[in-house]
Amino acid sequence: MASTLKLFMLLPVILLLLQEAYGTIDVEARGDNFNCNKREGPCSQRSLCECDPNLQLGRHSDQLWHYNLRTNRCERGGYRDNCNSHTSSGACVMACER
């Protein structure tokens, strides 16, 4: 019973710490940087939508699409080697718009 009570009292503190660590869209502020360059390895599911689309990785193409975190929409244009670049509007929507 005493250990359950201690855990119950610690839970709000743990949740507060997690909220501080992951409560922002700014990747650098979160401190959990992930790969945004396709040439450096495979892209994670998060990087497909959360990498800054303005990172100039590779050539720019108006044939590509990227996900804009601010508008929560897929938009035309992207950099070929940026993980947040999709070959079609449909691919971007399927990966990112929920």
Swiss-Prot record:
Which cysteine pairs make disulfide bonds? 36-51, 43-83, 49-96, 74-92
Q: Which UniProt keywords apply?
A: Calcium-activated potassium channel impairing toxin, Disulfide bond, Ion channel impairing toxin, Potassium channel impairing toxin, Secreted, Signal, Toxin
Which Gene3D superfamilies does this entry report, sorted A to Z? Pancreatic trypsin inhibitor Kunitz domain (4.10.410.10)
Gene Ontology MF annotations: potassium channel regulator activity; serine-type endopeptidase inhibitor activity; toxin activity
InterPro entries registered for this protein in UniProt: Kunitz_BPTI_sf
Q: Which SUPFAM superfamilies match?
A: BPTI-like
- In the UniProt record, the signal sequence range is 1-23
Q: What is its main location?
A: secreted
Cellular component terms per the entry's GO annotation? extracellular region
Give the tissue specificity. Expressed in salivary glands.
Localization per record: Secreted
Tell me, how does this one assemble? Monomer.
Q: What does this protein do?
A: Activates large conductance calcium-activated potassium channels (maxiK, KCNMA1/KCNMB), when tested at micromolar concentrations, suggesting a potential mechanism for regulating host blood supply during feeding. Shows no antiprotease activity, and does not prevent ADP-, PAF- or collagen-induced platelet aggregation. Has no effect on blood coagulation and does not inhibit the alternative or classical complement cascades.
Q: What is this protein called?
A: R.appendiculatus Kunitz/BPTI-like protein
